[in-house]
Amino acid sequence: MSKILKIQYLKLYNVISCFLWMSVLLRTGLIWGITKDTAVVFHETNTLVRWVQTLAIAEVFHSIFGLVSSSPLTTIIQVASRLYLVWGVCYPFSYVIEGSPIYLSMIIAWSITEIIRYAFYAFNLNGDIPAFLTWLRYNTFLILYPIGAGSEFLLVLKSRIAAQYVWSLNKLLWPILMSIYPPGLYIMYTHMLAQRRKISKRAAARRT
């Protein structure tokens, strides 16, 4: 793939992904604003969120085949954990998840994070990142990541409780997932902290 074609493809991917997550956030906000009912929000957004998140599988291949500089390990951890949430928790255990405000907090945290991330990547490919977007990218995760990760963990816990009463693959996967999940979250958070320090050093160097 030529460099120009690669850049154009990645721009298109990031712009589309940004707008898809904007649609998730807008839909979530509108439905919650009208109904104030988390069950309605879940039923009206669950399918959209599931497929928008599934699209991120492409990012694993982007990293593996060198289209982007992201580490395949961190990309796989991030995408796999999200896919587990949408397909392994929210989909089969919708009857447990639908009334929980935790789902709402998770989707809001995910949406804002992804809108900022994809917009940042798109502008970066264009060679001109607005300063405010750089600030958002490397500061909002300090709040949004714990909210999102905490919500994810609580939803996984709710599904685990429900899985006790029915046969579920979650029963078999639970010990493995719980041994991988905490270190995976730690790796992702410390990776972002390292990126934040790197950007801060660059900004300080430009000012001197």
From Swiss-Prot:
This is Probable very-long-chain (3R)-3-hydroxyacyl-CoA dehydratase. Keywords: Endoplasmic reticulum, Fatty acid biosynthesis, Fatty acid metabolism, Lipid biosynthesis, Lipid metabolism, Lyase, Membrane, Transmembrane, Transmembrane helix. InterPro entries: Tyr_Pase-like_PTPLA. The keyword Transcription does not apply. Catalyzes the third of the four reactions of the long-chain fatty acids elongation cycle. This endoplasmic reticulum-bound enzymatic process, allows the addition of two carbons to the chain of long- and very long-chain fatty acids/VLCFAs per cycle. This enzyme catalyzes the dehydration of the 3-hydroxyacyl-CoA intermediate into trans-2,3-enoyl-CoA, within each cycle of fatty acid elongation. Thereby, it participates in the production of VLCFAs of different chain lengths that are involved in multiple biological processes as precursors of membrane lipids and lipid mediators. Its EC number is 4.2.1.134. One of its GO terms (cellular component) is endoplasmic reticulum membrane. It is found in: Endoplasmic reticulum membrane. Pfam families: PTPLA (PF04387). It is a multi-pass membrane protein. The keyword Magnesium does not apply. Belongs to the very long-chain fatty acids dehydratase HACD family. Pathway: Lipid metabolism; fatty acid biosynthesis. The chain crosses the membrane at residues 12-35, 47-67, 79-97, 103-123, 135-157, 172-192. It catalyses: a very-long-chain (3R)-3-hydroxyacyl-CoA = a very-long-chain (2E)-enoyl-CoA + H2O. Residues 1-11, 68-78, 124-134, 193-208 are cytoplasmic.
